[in-house]
Structures are given as C-alpha cells and as structure tokens.
C-alpha cells in the first residue's frame, strides 16, 4: 500500500520570515506527527529556514532541480546542493515549468534520474491541457509523460518515485476535476507503472493536484488509486494546510 502524502507547492511565495512563521504554526498544531507524510516545497531562498525550523516529520521539498551536478549553469541549483541542505523531495515537470519555461519531457527525465541518484524523491507532475482533454487524449498524454519520465530509471530506485496528476486546466483556476475523473487517470498511471515494474506499482504514491482545498480533498482521498494531494495556494497558511492533513489522516496508507 502506498503512503499518504500531502505536499504543498508554495510556488513563488513565502520568504524566510514567512516560512518560519508557517513552521511555528505547524508545531503549535501538532506536538506529535500527524500520521500523514507532510511535505512543503518552498522557494529556494526559504529551504534552509524550513529545514532548520521544522520537526522531523515535516519534510522539505524543492520546486525544481537542474540535471547537471555542477558547472557553468547560471541561476540553476544542482541535486547535490539540495541533498546537502536536507531536501528530501523535489517537484519535477510541473505544468508551469513545462509551459512557461519550455521544459521538455527529455529534461524531466534527466531531472528524475539525477534526483534519484542523490536520494531525493521526485514528485513527477503529469497532466493534460484543456485542448487535449476536449480531444479525448487525456490518458494518451499522461501515459506518454509517465513513460518518458521513467525512461532508463534504475529499477531499484523506482519505489522512491511519486506521481502527481495535475490537469493543466485545473491548476489555479478554481476548477477541480471530479473524484471519478481523477481516479480514472490515476488508475491509468498506476497501470503504466505496473507495466514497467509490477512489484512496486501498488506502493508508489499517486497524488491529485489542481484547485485542491479542504472542502474537496475527501472526494479525491476516497478513491482507490489516489494517495494524497499536491496543493498550491491552500498550503500557504498553516491553519489551512492542517485542515488538509486532518482530512487526509482519515484515509490511512502505508506509514512509509
């Protein structure tokens, strides 16, 4: 059984001071671990504060990584640097990276492989655009993204991968997929993984992302193949993030 994860993607929000305030709010709410894998992915400048201030159960992620270990790559951050900071997760292939920064499937794959090399768990984002959805190509698009992301991934590291289904049309729009629609895609993601390695497919967390909030999280968590959520705006405030954790903890998964 896959573990339950609620991951927060802060995008370009919260500097060091706001990060420390968030952690203080989390520690005030939970004196003991909330029985859900909790991951926050802040901007690069706030990673050290999150690592240093957080209790052990509050995991730190990054929002991006470069696929080279070092060199003349102005503005980039290597997986070695992230690992040294204590980063445990990294979001790879988010639609904003793909669309705004023209990140290709090939680059996503390179980032996945080098993150795994350094022991960082990639949260691989896949999802269709509104046009692809209207053309009935959702499963085809997502399958191709999954296969490309996992190309040449060493089999004994596959269990460290996390997938997040984020329909592009739902991100930041206030429009979420239905639980049934998200389940159909997440089930397909798991079946594609099973074709590559059936022994780990059931243990890989598959998350839903796209206008997730405390009021609709239960609809997604109630599905057989959804193990949590990748959350944007509703993860910025400790109180709201804790509300998400309270919903998620009612759906037990593997404790990891």
UniProtKB/Swiss-Prot annotation:
Its EC number is 5.3.1.1. It catalyses: D-glyceraldehyde 3-phosphate = dihydroxyacetone phosphate. The keyword Cytoplasm applies. GO terms for biological process: gluconeogenesis; glyceraldehyde-3-phosphate biosynthetic process; glycerol catabolic process; glycolytic process. Its main location: cytoplasm. The active site is at residues 94, 166. It is found in: Cytoplasm. SUPFAM superfamilies: Triosephosphate isomerase (TIM). The keyword Cytoplasm applies. Keywords: Cytoplasm, Gluconeogenesis, Glycolysis, Isomerase. One of its GO terms (molecular function) is triose-phosphate isomerase activity. It is an enzyme of class 5 (isomerase). Pfam families: TIM. GO terms for cellular component: cytosol. Pathway: Carbohydrate biosynthesis; gluconeogenesis; Carbohydrate degradation; glycolysis; D-glyceraldehyde 3-phosphate from glycerone phosphate: step 1/1. Substrate binds at residues 9-11, 172, 211, 232-233. Belongs to the triosephosphate isomerase family. Involved in the gluconeogenesis. Catalyzes stereospecifically the conversion of dihydroxyacetone phosphate (DHAP) to D-glyceraldehyde-3-phosphate (G3P). Homodimer. This is Triosephosphate isomerase. The lineage of its organism: Bacteria, Bacillati, Bacillota, Clostridia, Natranaerobiales.
